[in-house]
């Protein structure tokens, strides 16, 4: 599972959404 920093959600295309 990919986890982003500080409670952000990983996007299916890459990157994070906060």
UniProtKB/Swiss-Prot annotation:
Keyword Disulfide bond attached: yes
Keyword Zinc: no
Disulfide bonds: 4-16, 8-18
Post-translational modification Cysteine amide, affected residues: 18
GO molecular function, one term: toxin activity
Assigned keywords, A-Z: Amidation, Disulfide bond, Secreted, Toxin
Tissue: Expressed by the venom gland.
Assigned GO CC terms: extracellular region
Subcellular location as annotated: Secreted
Family (UniProt): Belongs to the poneritoxin-Ae1 family.
Name used for this protein in its record: U1-poneritoxin-Ae1c
């Amino acid at each position: 599972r990919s986890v982003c920093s500080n409670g952000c959600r990983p996007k299916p295309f890459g990157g994070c959404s906060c």
